[in-house]
Amino acid sequence: MPTSIKAIKESLEAVTSLLDPLFQELATDTRSGVQKALKSRQKVIQAELAEEERLEAMLSYEKALYKKGYKAIAGIDEVGRGPLAGPVVAACVILPKYCKIKGLNDSKKIPKAKHETIYQAVKEKALAIGIGIIDNQLIDEVNIYEATKLAMLEAIKQLEGQLTQPDYLLIDAMTLDIAISQQSILKGDANSLSIAAASIVAKVTRDQMMANYDRIFPGYDFAKNAGYGTKEHLQGLKAYGITPIHRKSFEPVKSMCCDSTNP
C-alpha cells in the first residue's frame, strides 16, 4: 500500500467500490490528509452510485418496452408553452438501447451551466433527432395546446429519411394522432431518459433562438427570460411595445393589442 499522501490520493482515484479493501486499510491512518482524501473519494463514489441508480430508474419505461420487442423508442417533449413571446419547440429523440447519459434529467432540473454539455452528449449518442418549431402566429391561430401537438408531430416528421425510425413513442403528458404505438407519461421528462433527452434538445434549441431574438429585439431581455413574463420583459413591453414574435393571444400582450386598436 502506498504511504505518501500523494500516492494514496492517486490510488484512491482508481477505486470505484465502497467495499474496496483500501478504504478499510486507510481507516486506521491518523493523518488528516489521508482521512480527508478517504472521505472525499467515498463521497464521489456515493454520488456516482446514486446517479447510476437514478438513471436506471429513468430507464424503467424503456426497459419494459425493450422486453416487449420494441427497438427504437423515441422520447418526445416540448419547451415554451408559457412564454409571452417566441415559438413552442418540440424534440423527438431516439437513444441507443439502455443508453445512460450522466446528468440527463428534466431540463428544468439541470443547472443552466450544464445545458450545453448535456445537449452535446445527447447529440453525440442519439440515433436520431427531430425538432419541430411552431411560431407565435400559429400559436395565436390554433391555441398553445394544439400548437404543442403540431410541434411534436413536426419533430417526428423530421425523423423521416434518417436511418432509425421510431416504433414506439414516449410522450410527455400528451397523446398524438399518429399511427405509431405510444404512451403518455405525466412528468415524463423526469421519469424517462428518452423524454429527458428530448427535453434538453428542445430547451437548448429554443434558448438559442431566443438569444438570437434578443439581438434583433433588444430591451426585452429575451436572452435571459426566454420570452417568459419577467419584470424586465414586462418593462420592455411597456417601454417599446409589442414585437413581431409576441403572442397576441397571451395576456398582457392581448390587452395591449386591444388598447392599441381602440382610440
From Swiss-Prot:
Q: Which residues bind a divalent metal cation?
A: 77-78, 172
Root EC class = hydrolase
Domain RNase H type-2 residue range list: 71-262
Q: GO CC terms for this protein?
A: cytoplasm; ribonuclease H2 complex
Pfam families associated with the record? RNase_HII
Q: Which cofactors are reported in the record for this sequence? A: Mn(2+); Mg(2+)
What are the protein's UniProt keywords?
Cytoplasm, Endonuclease, Hydrolase, Manganese, Metal-binding, Nuclease
Q: Which Gene3D superfamilies match?
A: Ribonuclease H-like superfamily/Ribonuclease H (3.30.420.10)
One GO BP: DNA replication, removal of RNA primer
Per its UniProt record, what CDD domains does this chain match?
RNase_HII_bacteria_HII_like
Its Enzyme Commission number(s) read 3.1.26.4
Q: Which family does it belong to?
A: Belongs to the RNase HII family.
PANTHER family for the chain: RIBONUCLEASE H2 SUBUNIT A, RIBONUCLEASE HII
Q: What is this protein called?
A: Ribonuclease HII
* Species whose genome carries this gene: Streptococcus pyogenes serotype M1
State the encoding gene: rnhB
